[in-house]
A protein has these predicted regions:
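Aliphatic-rich helix starts adjacent to a transmembrane/signal segment
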Residues: 3-69
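Short, glycine/small-hydrophobic-rich surface segments
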Residues: 46, 52-55, 68-93
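Short linear sequence signals and composition-biased patches located at protein termini or domain-edge surfaces
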Residues: 136-154, 213, 219-261
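A generic beta-sheet turn/junction motif
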Residues: 90-92, 204, 241
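Short, mixed charged/polar active-site loops
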Residues: 63, 94-98, 115-121, 195, ...
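Short, exposed beta-strand/loop patches in secreted or surface proteins that constitute
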Residues: 72-81, 98-100, 127-129, 153-164, ...
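Small/polar beta-strand repeat architecture
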Residues: 152-182, 187-229
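Type IV pilin-like appendage domain
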Residues: 80-154
Length: 261
């Protein structure tokens, strides 16, 4: 008779020491893994916010550039060209566009008349955080890309005199040229001998402009207008996404001015 021996394989469990060692190892690794996972998820969230903010900003900037490229003229009405309002007429059927950065944290624009459509939301209009000032605004530029202190600075009077030796344009009193700054391109009209465009080299005071180009001596008498002209607009805006500020700046000028420069 043959006998077969049946071998049984018995599993052996963890010893107490091994179990304690495993528990200690897990307690060390789990917090570190949690921090890694948490950090990864936060990075993904911040990246997504930045991507979506860039997409929204790109859409707004492309619209803004397209509209400014088609400008026929900027409004000369008081209050229509400010840091938070921009009004202009387009070559497209002479439509009037108006952009506004309003107090409801939106950038809106309308064509010909209200209501205005929303271009961007959650825009920081003017706030200070950690001693840093965040301001969304329109900045107006002349032909030399210099900032205009006032979008359309202008003075008209019969007391404007020209001096060829000093290359100066002067009025006797007041603050007639207070809104003009060095570097601005000015347009003179109504003059007998000095109509045209000139570059402001300096301002002796609020009553005297010195230009870079030659001028002809001419006494007061004619009704002469000295004015600046907007050739481009810079739009700066801050988007608030989560707890982060995202800054965007874009500059646009009308197509005709780009060809003239």
């Amino acid at each position: 008779m043959e006998f077969r021996r049946i071998l049984q394989k018995r599993s052996k469990g963890f010893s107490l020491i091994e179990m304690i060692a495993a528990m200690v190892l897990v307690s060390i690794l789990v917090p570190g893994i949690s921090l890694i996972v948490h950090g990864t998820m936060m990075n993904i969230a911040f990246t997504n916010m930045a991507v979506f903010a860039n997409m929204e900003a790109d859409y707004a900037q492309r619209n803004f550039i397209k509209h400014i490229n088609g400008v026929k003229s900027f409004s000369v009405t008081d209050g229509d060209l400010t840091v938070d309002k921009l009004t202009f007429t387009s070559y497209l059927e002479d439509a009037e566009y108006q952009y506004e950065i309003d107090d409801s944290r939106q950038i809106k624009y309308s064509i010909n008349a209200p209501p205005a459509g929303i271009l961007l939301q959650n825009v920081v209009k003017d706030t200070t955080f950690d001693a840093v000032n965040y301001v969304s605004k329109f900045t107006y530029k002349d032909r030399n890309n210099n900032n205009l202190s006032v979008p359309v600075a202008s003075y008209t009077g019969t007391n404007v005199a020209f001096n060829s030796g000093a290359k100066s344009i002067a009025v006797p009193s007041g603050n007639s040229f207070a809104d003009f700054v060095a570097g601005n391109i000015i347009t003179i009209s109504g003059s007998t001998s000095n109509n045209g465009t000139f570059t402001i080299a300096s301002l002796t005071n609020d009553n005297t402009i010195v230009v870079s180009e030659s001028i002809t001596t001419e006494g007061a008498g004619d009704a002469i207008t000295v004015s600046t002209e907007v050739h481009g607009v810079e739009l700066t805006f801050f988007l608030l996404r989560g707890e982060s500020f995202y800054k965007y700046t874009t500059f646009a000028t009308i197509d005709k001015n780009q060809l003239d420069i």
